[in-house]
Amino acid sequence: DDLFNINAGIVKLFGVTTLDVVRTQDGGTEVVEAK
């Protein structure tokens, strides 16, 4: 879901989380540790 991905990016931007949500090749989403 695009909105979820955008929100996750915003949250990471403000340092609230150390997780990053990325799109997988099959169109799903995957939560990975931020580097």
UniProtKB/Swiss-Prot annotation:
Transmembrane helix among keywords: no
Record-listed substrate binding positions: 23
Keyword ATP-binding on entry: no
GO molecular function, one term: L-malate dehydrogenase (NAD+) activity
Catalytic activity as recorded in UniProt: (S)-malate + NAD(+) = oxaloacetate + NADH + H(+)
GO BP field: tricarboxylic acid cycle
Major subcellular location class: mitochondrion
Enzyme Commission numbers on file: 1.1.1.37
Top EC class for this record: oxidoreductase
Recorded GO CC terms: mitochondrial matrix
Cysteine pairings via disulfide bonds: none
Record key words, sorted: Mitochondrion, NAD, Oxidoreductase, Tricarboxylic acid cycle
Annotated residues for binding of NAD(+): 7
Origin: domain of life: Eukaryota
Membership in a protein family: Belongs to the LDH/MDH superfamily. MDH type 1 family.
Subunit structure as annotated in this protein's UniProt entry: Homodimer.
Name the UniProt record assigns to this protein: Malate dehydrogenase, mitochondrial
Source organism (scientific name): Capsicum annuum var. annuum
